[in-house]
């Protein structure tokens, strides 16, 4: 599994309340959630995000309230992957469960700049900054977790396993 796109970068401690504000939790429609993704942190996010873009952030990405709405809004906005120094554990699990590819790599998250072009090889955990030519080694998921993400999330993975 691979991803390639332009970087949209954020800092440390980006919490689920700014990823998708609580006032929008009354819907589970991915398109509606995407239209409000990051709006309290970055008013222009929905205007500048393109399908395939890669979100890069610092430490503790997705901290705060446990809500699947956060990774759903990111995925539905067109983001193909999130790279961070670290993820809050509940966000990490929710991202896998809904099929949003994520990867931890402190060095990449620190070095990569907004608007850089990056390519991610999830099987190897490799992140290549196509703008600078630098390559980083991230932590790849175990095979079974990659299968869940590739299946578009845990529910579809289970459905596929039962059929």
UniProtKB/Swiss-Prot annotation:
Binding partners and assembly: Heterodimer of LeuC and LeuD.
GO-annotated molecular function: 3-isopropylmalate dehydratase activity
The protein's name: 3-isopropylmalate dehydratase small subunit
TM regions (residue ranges): none
EC number(s) reported in the record: 4.2.1.33
Enzyme class: lyase
Entry function: Catalyzes the isomerization between 2-isopropylmalate and 3-isopropylmalate, via the formation of 2-isopropylmaleate.
Sequence similarity: Belongs to the LeuD family. LeuD type 2 subfamily.
Keyword vocabulary terms for this entry: Amino-acid biosynthesis, Branched-chain amino acid biosynthesis, Leucine biosynthesis, Lyase
Reactions catalysed: (2R,3S)-3-isopropylmalate = (2S)-2-isopropylmalate
Pathway info: Amino-acid biosynthesis; L-leucine biosynthesis; L-leucine from 3-methyl-2-oxobutanoate: step 2/4
InterPro entries recorded: Aconitase/3IPM_dehydase_swvl (IPR015928), AconitaseA/IPMdHydase_ssu_swvl (IPR000573), IPMI_Swivel (IPR033940), LeuD (IPR050075), LeuD/DmdB_bac (IPR011824), LeuD_type2/HacB/DmdB (IPR011827)
Pfam families assigned to the protein according to its UniProt record, in alphabetical order: Aconitase_C
Cystines in this chain: none
Single GO BP term: L-leucine biosynthetic process
